[in-house]
């Protein structure tokens, strides 16, 4: 689970670079902005860390929280791709599609972790 999170953290740096490029194509400067939805998901993840620290359910809970973030990002990038295409901005759409593809791949990898044993270990420990 830790390796998957680290891999995605590094991918996120590339995603930020792409977003900065998208903003440049519109003649704008990118800026960080707080997202209450993501903040809520992160808060849930923090609660999972507190409640299940050291327990087998911890990894399952963290995978679930990470997938919630991925699903939010997939929804947002999907919308941005559609808007870019409708605006005739194929170059922007291509940048956003690259990130969308990586977000979907991360979600699939997280599903693989869950189905590959993380969820089962949590269930066995709870029984």
Predicted regions and their residues:
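Amphipathic alpha-helical hairpins
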Residues: 1-127
């Amino acid at each position: 689970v830790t390796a998957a999170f680290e891999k995605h953290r590094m991918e996120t740096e590339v995603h930020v670079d792409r977003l900065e490029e998208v903003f440049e194509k519109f003649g704008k400067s990118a800026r960080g902005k707080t997202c209450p939805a993501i903040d809520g998901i992160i808060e849930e993840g923090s609660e999972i860390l507190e409640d299940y620290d050291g327990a087998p359910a911890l990894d399952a809970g963290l995978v679930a929280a990470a997938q919630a973030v991925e699903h939010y990002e997939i929804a947002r990038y999907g919308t941005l791709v559609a808007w870019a295409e409708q605006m005739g901005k194929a170059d922007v759409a291509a940048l956003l599609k690259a990130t969308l593809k990586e977000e979907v791949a991360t979600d699939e990898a997280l599903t693989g972790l869950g189905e590959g044993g993380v969820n089962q270990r949590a269930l066995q420990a709870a029984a």
